[in-house]
């Protein structure tokens, strides 16, 4: 997967430079509302229910300040990713018990006919496994800076 292909799932309206929420449930709701406000999902309540259900199976807080809540839902019409930052951090139940600051919400249609969902999840985890990339992402203040950081992570 190329940087451009990965970036095609993001968008300026799906870039949140500072989350207002300070709780896990609040973050999930705030990120789901980004998609709802954009008109990218059919039923915001259904989407939020799906995200919460997925979290109940086990936290998507990966550790090292990163959380990747994700899931497939009949509310989603297309695969989309929301990127959000929390400078203060949020207790997300991460594996290392550290607060999360970088959030990637991946939402895909229930019938993922393009088989995008799992490769996207894997690629994001791979990209943020690099400490230097995580540090640069914490400093982004615009969608342009975010896309540049992702391109650099791919060596482009």
What are these regions (language model features)?
Residues 1-156:
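Cytosolic covalent-transfer regions centered on His/Cys nucleophiles
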């Amino acid at each position: 997967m190329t940087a451009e292909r990965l970036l095609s799932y993001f968008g300026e309206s799906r870039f949140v430079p500072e989350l207002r929420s300070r709780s896990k449930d609040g973050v999930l709701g705030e990120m789901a509302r980004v998609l709802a406000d954009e008109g990218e999902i059919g039923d915001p309540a259904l989407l939020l229910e799906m995200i919460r259900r997925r979290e109940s199976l086990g936290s998507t807080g990966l550790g090292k300040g990163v959380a990747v809540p994700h899931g497939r839902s009949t509310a989603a019409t297309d695969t989309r990713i929301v990127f959000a930052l929390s400078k203060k951090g949020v207790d997300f139940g991460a594996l290392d018990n550290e607060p999360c600051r970088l959030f990637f919400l991946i939402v895909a249609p229930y019938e993922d006919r393009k088989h995008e969902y799992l490769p996207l999840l894997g690629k994001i985890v791979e990209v943020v496994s690099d400490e230097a990339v995580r540090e640069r992402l914490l400093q982004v203040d615009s969608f342009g800076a975010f896309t540049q950081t992702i391109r650099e992570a791919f060596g482009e």
